[in-house]
Amino acid sequence: MNSNGNVSVSGPNEKIIQNKHNDSKEEKIMPLVTSKEMLLKAQKGGYAVGAFNAENMEMVKAIIQAAEELKAPVMIQTTPSTVKYGTVETYAAIVAAEAAKASVPVCLHLDHGSSFELAMQA
């Protein structure tokens, strides 16, 4: 139980959060998935995965919202200039927070990384 009084129950690809004050409401939480996992499923299923560059939180939210409307997995891409403006940690936290609320798989991808060090940090 966390400080909000919620109980977490883990499943294979998601967590179910049950509010102790209202057991009838459940919220599914989808964590970030790896691009490898996402692309292997797409290859096996015979479908493509959209990958979109997002420069800020509003773009991340809009991309995930569109993916949810289409019931499709989505790859959020960032660039070296975007993570230089903020930080890798900040950008990853934004995407992870939005992915946690999503009903579809979301992964994060560093597009056109400029160095090995940045790729390892990402």
Report residues per predicted region.
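Short, Lys/Arg-enriched N-terminal segments with co-localized hydrophobic residues
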Residues: 11-29
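Ser/Thr/Pro/Gly-rich low-complexity, intrinsically disordered segments
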Residues: 3-5
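Generic structural signal for hydrophobic
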Residues: 42, 67, 121-122
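N-terminal active-site wall of soluble small-molecule enzyme domains
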Residues: 37, 59, 82-122
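N-terminal amphipathic alpha-helix/helix-capping segment at the start of soluble metabolic enzymes
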Residues: 29-50
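Hydrophobic faces of well-ordered beta-strands that scaffold small-molecule active sites
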Residues: 48-53, 74-77, 106-111
